[in-house]
Amino acid sequence: MAEAGTGEPSPSVEGEHGTEYDTLPSDTVSLSDSDSDLSLPGGAEVEALSPMGLPGEEDSGPDEPPSPPSGLLPATVQPFHLRGMSSTFSQRSRDIFDCLEGAARRAPSSVAHTSMSDNGGFKRPLAPSGRSPVEGLGRAHRSPASPRVPPVPDYVAHPERWTKYSLEDVTEVSEQSNQATALAFLGSQSLAAPTDCVSSFNQDPSSCGEGRVIFTKPVRGVEARHERKRVLGKVGEPGRGGLGNPATDRGEGPVELAHLAGPGSPEAEEWGSHHGGLQEVEALSGSVHSGSVPGLPPVETVGFHGSRKRSRDHFRNKSSSPEDPGAEV
């Protein structure tokens, strides 16, 4: 049986498993590449002795049930130990666990108590405080802040820069005193105003309207319409285009612009209402034309005037001739 304190395997165990060195290692055990001279026997046992372990479990094999406890729990914690391994592997494992035990001994008792519970489990570390210990130490060594002194106003520190005004000699005023002061001021202003000033037109409230200027909208369109009606009435009188009229004798009749009136315009309505859309422009007798045959009845020329607006470009002036440049054909 291997001793728990030394960690060295016994000769009896090594002789018992000496024939099993050619077996392959288990998948659950892994070694580094540097351990080329090591071999893991198939019957190697891993043993971890914890404070809760029982003394009867050391002699029991892997297939045998553990024996009932026959004594008290060991007082000290025994290190981790593997049985059935080579001396090199056992030495490495012992060195590793010795370093861990040394680090645990060097740790302060308060840290060990907070990091490990009574049953061997790890506890969650305490949350850090709001300020670090270095910061708190620096604040502790710092001198207490002196009380803040309010700043001195500039008019106290430099009174020569300021001018002091006082209202001690001013009497208390009220609404009645303000009203009396205003009326006295207005009375003095009215007395100082000149009386021989002549107001311009429409400024005197007592005027009767003499000399006023009245602005009204011009009625040029209405007057032009009445004038046009009057001219058309004179043209439409009987006997205007007879033989006694010199204008008719020359073959020239009155020129009317009724065809330029737009639809719905007042001129078109007046033209249609008075003449019914049919206007006699000129009445010429047969003797006026040079090629007329005597004895024929006189011919009357009738012009039809519509209310549709036409462009002036389609009409030729009487003074222009087809031979003139720019004349329309």
Curated annotation (Swiss-Prot):
* Keyword tags: Acetylation, Cytoplasm, mRNA processing, mRNA splicing, Nucleus, Phosphoprotein, Spliceosome
Where does the record place the modification N6-acetyllysine?
A: K217
The keyword Calcium belongs to this UniProt entry's keyword annotation: no
The listed outcome for N202A is: Loss of interaction with SNRNP200. Loss of interaction with PRPF8 and SNRNP200
Q: Its GO biological process terms?
A: spliceosomal snRNP assembly; spliceosomal tri-snRNP complex assembly
Sorted alphabetically, which PANTHER family does this protein's record hold? TUMOR SUPPRESSING SUBTRANSFERABLE CANDIDATE 4 TSSC4, U5 SMALL NUCLEAR RIBONUCLEOPROTEIN TSSC4
Name under which the protein is recorded: U5 small nuclear ribonucleoprotein TSSC4
- What organism does the UniProt record list as the source? Homo sapiens (Human)
